[in-house]
A protein has these predicted regions:
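Alpha-helix boundary/capping residues
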Residues: 20-23, 31-34, 51, 141
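Conserved GNAT-fold acetyl-CoA-binding loop/helix
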Residues: 28-49
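A short helix-loop-beta-strand connector motif used in the catalytic cores of GNAT acetyltransferases and
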Residues: 36, 49-63
Length: 168
């Protein structure tokens, strides 16, 4: 499947809201919930507008992962951009019906290609120790695991977060 990364805009709010609502339960199985308020339409739009302000000021870059017809398959972001050490944090999520098709692997590859345009030389990522698919996606795209781990609690279970770094 051919995908493309499209910069997030205000016009994406309604379709993105539907995507998030459709995938809420799936996402919350592997990452902490964004809370019930996030799924209230007006609050979602406010938060979306706030993210676009971050993007406008250069502290983050938000992309939608879309197919050839323009449907949202997922999201991918570079957040917490640091202009001094030219770094950012990677985050992504793929809708449940689109997993296992290589979309995340390709989206990360495409995003890495954008790094030079955003003056980013280092990208950091985290994933849980049990998320083997994400670990594979990161290593396939040139990320290396670093000896930094932290413990998080999700649904009452302790999990290790594994840190990865990609550098130009």
């Amino acid at each position: 499947m051919k995908i493309q990364l499209k910069a997030c805009t205000a016009g994406d709010a309604d379709e993105l809201y539907a995507f998030e609502c459709d995938n809420r339960r799936y996402f919350e199985q592997s990452i902490p919930s964004r809370g019930d308020d996030y799924y209230v339409p007006d609050i979602f739009r406010e938060r979306h507008a706030a993210l676009l302000e971050e993007q406008k000021h250069g502290s983050s870059v938000y992309f939608l992962i879309k197919n050839e017809t323009g449907s949202i398959l997922g999201r991918i972001n570079l957040v917490d951009r640091n202009s001094i050490d030219k770094s950012a944090q990677l985050g992504y999520r793929i809708g449940q019906s689109h997993t296992g098709k290589g979309i995340a692997k390709e989206a990360v590859r495409l995003l890495i290609m954008h790094c030079q345009k955003f003056y980013i030389d280092k990208v950091e990522a985290k994933t849980t120790d049990g998320n083997f698919a994400s670990q594979k996606i990161l290593t396939h795209n040139g990320f290396r695991r670093v000896n930094k781990e932290e413990v998080v609690v999700l649904h009452g279970h302790r999990m290790m977060l594994i840190h990865y770094i990609w550098a130009r």
